[in-house]
A protein has these predicted regions:
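Well-ordered, non-membrane alpha-helical segments in soluble/globular domains
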Residues: 98-102, 146-157, 192-197, 316-325, ...
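Active-site beta->alpha N-cap acidic-glycine motif
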Residues: 58-169, 176-180, 202, 211-237, ...
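C-terminal domain-boundary segment and adjacent tail
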Residues: 71-73, 253-265, 324-401
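N-terminal pre-catalytic segment of deacetylase/amide-hydrolase enzymes
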Residues: 2-88, 96-103, 373-376
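Active-site-adjacent pocket scaffolds in enzyme catalytic domains
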Residues: 134-137, 146-150, 216-331, 386, ...
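Conserved, mostly hydrophobic/aromatic
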Residues: 108, 173, 199, 246, ...
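Short, well-ordered amphipathic alpha-helices
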Residues: 196-214, 360
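Active-site cleft segment of glycoside hydrolase catalytic domains centered on the general acid/base Glu
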Residues: 178-199, 203
Length: 401
């Protein structure tokens, strides 16, 4: 397995702690870069933080980014319900040795959908270069998730290129994934900005950090300027401090808050769209759970990731039905965007991946007029909407079902 295709035990413990706090709040509804260096030339060598010698970077990202395929969400017509949007975001978004991300992109093609991938920036920084990372409040090279397996970087770059070329969005899930005590919850505005700066550098300088990738034609069709939004580790962070950092970094939305099935609003002081994870009714129960796979995990298996095959089938079906019920609720109700979060992790026999993929295909079959869009697509639509129309939608009550 690659370094980031599983959340480590320590990470799950921190996640579960954060999830339990959140659960308590929801007991009721509510132009391509070219190679400038000939293959026969010897690359210049430089030293990095840990003393390792790596080739000086060739240009391996496209600046400005290659043109992104456009999407057009119809403007709401007078007297008609707006288009139902479904926004699926993936925390991590780094390809594994199982080809999980590529498979998910293939599902997106079936429904002409676009997703958001919140990239964990360390998935392109190999372990041999870990000392380049200077995490706020922690020792150099420290992280609560793994660094990249060097052998997987080539595949990850190719999949990231496919993501962009197929219209998907690349956001950030930051780097070290520090949750709980001593983690991101206590970071200042400047510490958040330091983390973002490093995340940008590791993306833009991926080739310099990975001399084992010998294909000189391999290039990302985008650079870090495309990052316009985020989700924080474990949904943590001091809101005023991080919002100030994100606005200063040119973000246009934030996706770390819990919420309800209601039309999004902007934070008044910094104009960031708030795209929350809503509470969904867990099928067959009276529980309302955040629409993220690990929140479902805690409620369905008490956080256990390895269960009996029969339990796997139960979890998959319950998760699938939870998503379908929520979509039916908003589609027949206030038409608020439906936000669903995932890690595309292998927990519980891949139950959450299977349920989400089934949902995407079946939802589009049942409701052909729905659109699967990215967070950035949604922000474009909302920003371009008639202000009076948008205000009216925002004043609709939360959807219950």
């Amino acid at each position: 397995m690659g370094g980031l295709d599983k959340v480590p035990v320590k990470g799950i413990a921190a996640v579960v702690g954060a999830v339990l706090l959140l659960i308590l709040a929801f007991t009721t509804p509510f132009s391509s870069a070219s190679d400038t260096q000939a293959a026969t030339e010897e690359p210049e060598v430089t030293q990095v933080g840990d003393g390792a010698a790596i080739p000086t970077a060739r240009t391996a990202v496209t600046t400005p980014p290659a043109e992104h395929p456009a999407v057009s969400i119809p403007a709401p017509a007078a007297g008609a319900k707006p288009t139902q949007t479904v926004v699926i975001s993936v925390d991590g978004g780094c390809e594994t040795d199982k080809g999980t991300i590529r498979s998910f992109l293939d599902v997106g093609k079936q429904v002409q959908g676009r997703f958001t991938f919140f990239m964990s920036g360390l998935c392109l920084l190999p372990d041999a270069q870990r000392m380049q990372y200077r995490p706020p409040g922690h020792l150099p090279g420290q992280s609560d998730i793994g660094f990249a397996t060097a052998e997987l970087v080539d595949a990850r770059v190719r999949v990231f290129a496919d993501m962009w070329n197929e219209g998907h969005e690349v956001g950030t899930h930051f780097l070290g994934h520090f949750c709980g005590s001593g983690g991101v919850a206590g970071w200042s505005t400047q510490e958040w900005r330091d983390e973002i700066t490093q995340a940008r550098q590791f993306l833009d300088n991926w080739a310099a950090n990975n001399p084992q990738v010998t294909d000189q034609s391999l290039t990302l069709p985008f650079d870090s300027s495309v990052i316009k939004g985020d989700r924080t580790p474990c949904l943590e962070g001091d809101r005023p401090a991080m919002w100030a950092a994100f606005a200063a970094e040119g973000f246009r939305y934030e996706a770390s808050d819990p919420g309800v099935l209601q039309w999004p609003r902007k934070v008044a002081q910094n104009k960031l769209w708030q795209f929350p994870l809503p509470a969904l009714k867990l099928s067959g129960t009276n529980l309302w759970v955040l629409s993220m796979d690990y929140n479902l995990l805690v409620n369905q298996t008490n956080g256990e990731t390895d269960v009996a095959p029969g339990e796997c089938a139960r979890v998959e079906q319950q998760t699938y039905q939870t998503y379908m019920d929520a979509l039916e609720g908003v589609y027949n109700g206030n038409r608020a965007p439906l936000f669903l979060g995932s890690h595309l992790n292998s927990w519980v026999c891949d139950s959450y991946i299977k349920a989400l993929q089934r949902f995407i295909v079946d939802a589009k079959t049942k409701y052909p007029d729905i659109m699967f869009v990215s967070n950035n697509d949604l922000a474009d639509w909302l920003d371009g909407m008639d202000p009076a129309t948008l205000k009216g939608l925002q004043q609709l009550p939360e959807q219950k079902y």
